[in-house]
């Protein structure tokens, strides 16, 4: 029993009933009242829509140009074959996001997933899954199948606008169901701990396609949920700060030579004689200081003030950290 009235009970794994290799029931208890539905619904949604897995996304069938055609010697039409390929349960080695597998079959009878040729990085979890039927001994079918890793459900229509220009004729797109979970349901029953009878027991009933064990699927779903909730544990601002462009320390015009002001020869020579080489040097001088410059009179001073004003500058400005390193090194 919890140590205080404010402490929440923590569920423990009570039972895993393995009905088959792909079907299991997982029971957790005790849960505080209402938490059965809270956790059950959250896990159910993640298991159905957010579990990563592998699925067939494209197929090329020899002699077939589009999905609305038929193939001689094959009982099913092409749309039925594509629908059957959606049910292919494929496990691909970690580290590979896409693989290609092939199928070549001839002779009368069913064509099943076990007829597919693949390398050691691929495993077919449902080898008895029927893809199509060949109707006579001379019939044959050959196809190249693309399997990709993804998450959730992605219809073929969502990929058409991205690939239509590059997709060659005869490459057929397949609706991709990446989730390894086929069915998921949960039930909340009454549970009891000592004198408390208002507690919940959560029973999760789940079936997978065989590429992932039910127990591991629930473990992964719980991990996804916990990672998403981490942000709420510490509500500090965790946004990545925007990178701001560094503003130059000085207005670029201040780094330009005095000659760019196009002063009269007399005024320009007077400034050079006083070692005023850059506009930044000039704007820091006052009128009084410039009038003390030999051969620089009021007419030249007025010219300098007017030229600076036309550029939004004036005499007597204060520039911190002047001169910049690039000028000081010169």
From Swiss-Prot:
Homodimer. The RNAP catalytic core consists of 2 alpha, 1 beta, 1 beta' and 1 omega subunit. When a sigma factor is associated with the core the holoenzyme is formed, which can initiate transcription. The keyword Zinc does not apply. The gene is rpoA. Belongs to the RNA polymerase alpha chain family. This is DNA-directed RNA polymerase subunit alpha. It comes from Vibrio parahaemolyticus serotype O3:K6 (strain RIMD 2210633). GO terms for molecular function: DNA binding; DNA-directed RNA polymerase activity; protein dimerization activity. Keywords: DNA-directed RNA polymerase, Nucleotidyltransferase, Transcription, Transferase. Its EC number is 2.7.7.6. Residues 1-236 are annotated as: Alpha N-terminal domain (alpha-NTD). Residues 250-330 are annotated as: Alpha C-terminal domain (alpha-CTD). It is an enzyme of class 2 (transferase). The N-terminal domain is essential for RNAP assembly and basal transcription, whereas the C-terminal domain is involved in interaction with transcriptional regulators and with upstream promoter elements. It catalyses: RNA(n) + a ribonucleoside 5'-triphosphate = RNA(n+1) + diphosphate. It holds the Pfam family RNA_pol_A_bac. DNA-dependent RNA polymerase catalyzes the transcription of DNA into RNA using the four ribonucleoside triphosphates as substrates. One of its GO terms (biological process) is DNA-templated transcription. GO terms for cellular component: cytoplasm; DNA-directed RNA polymerase complex.
């Amino acid at each position: 029993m919890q140590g205080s009235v404010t402490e929440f009970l923590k569920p423990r794994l009570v039972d895993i009933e393995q009905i088959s290799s792909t079907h299991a029931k997982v029971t957790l208890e005790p849960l505080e009242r209402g938490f059965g539905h809270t956790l059950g619904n959250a896990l159910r949604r993640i298991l159905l829509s957010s579990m990563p897995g592998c699925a067939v996304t494209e197929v090329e069938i020899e002699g077939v140009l589009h999905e609305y055609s038929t193939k001689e010697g094959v009982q099913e039409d092409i749309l039925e074959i594509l629908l059957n390929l959606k049910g292919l349960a494929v496990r691909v080695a970690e580290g590979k996001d896409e693989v290609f597998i092939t199928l070549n079959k001839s002779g009368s009878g069913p064509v099943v997933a076990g007829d597919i040729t693949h390398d050691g990085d691929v495993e077919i979890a449902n080898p008895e899954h029927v893809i199509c039927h060949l109707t006579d001994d001379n019939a044959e079918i050959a196809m190249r199948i693309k399997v990709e890793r993804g998450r959730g459900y992605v219809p073929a229509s969502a990929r058409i606008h991205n690939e239509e220009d590059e997709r060659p004729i005869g490459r057929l797109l397949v609706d991709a169901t990446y989730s390894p979970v086929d069915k998921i349901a949960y039930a909340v029953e009454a549970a009891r701990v000592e004198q408390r009878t208002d507690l919940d027991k959560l029973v999760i009933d789940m079936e997978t396609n065989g590429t992932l064990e039910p127990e591991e699927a629930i473990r992964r779903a719980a991990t996804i949920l916990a990672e998403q909730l981490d942000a709420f544990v510490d509500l500090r601002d965790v946004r990545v700060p925007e990178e701001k462009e560094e503003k130059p320390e000085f207005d670029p015009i201040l780094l330009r030579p005095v000659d760019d002001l196009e002063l009269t020869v007399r005024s320009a020579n007077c400034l050079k004689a006083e070692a005023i080489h850059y506009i930044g040097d000039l704007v820091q001088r006052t009128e009084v200081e410039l009038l003390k410059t030999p051969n620089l009179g009021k007419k030249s001073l007025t010219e300098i003030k007017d030229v600076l004003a036309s550029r939004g500058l004036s005499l007597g400005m204060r520039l911190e950290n002047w001169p910049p390193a690039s000028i000081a090194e010169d």
